[in-house]
Amino acid sequence: WYAPKRFFDLYPLEKIRLPQLLANDLADVPAQGRALSAKRRAEFLNIKKHGKWKEAIRAYLASISFADAQLGRLLDSLDRSAHQRNTIVVFWSDHGWHLGEKNHWHKSTLWEEATRIPFLIAAPGVTKGGTTCPRPVDTLSIYPTLLELCGLKPMPGLDGTSIVPLLKNPATPWAIPAITEFQRGQCAVRSE
């Protein structure tokens, strides 16, 4: 993880809280899930072995804060520009990250830590700054959402569902599950 020192300074090591590790945390996981998790376990075991767990979490948090500051600079500049009223900003990641949960340090799982992503949309006249929505959605919704926000018609057979109703009102009932896929044939479905 790379970030200027001032972002590391936001997270003193003595204040870093480590995730709880359960001795039998994988006991209820099917063999396929345990096998997937085992492929990347060496990285986490190495971090623990060398006493770098808190430092690794600190670096992760510093990187997030650094990225957040840069996004803030971009949005502040946009707010001061002539393009503020006709620019849609979409920011997302393709995966989340485990910080030791389930003895895992990486992405590459179908658990919450790896499937929950940052996902922000700022659309003039549609979204309100600081609004959050607890509904599960997936990245297949980005393209149809942008089409609707731009007043364009979707092509037939397009995957995904526009989330414009949620952008307008996060309390809108939502029955469409979020689907996450990792490698071929390994999926997770998340709904309310």
What are the roles of these predicted feature ranges?
Residues 1-136, 149-156:
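Active-site-proximal cap/lid insertion segments
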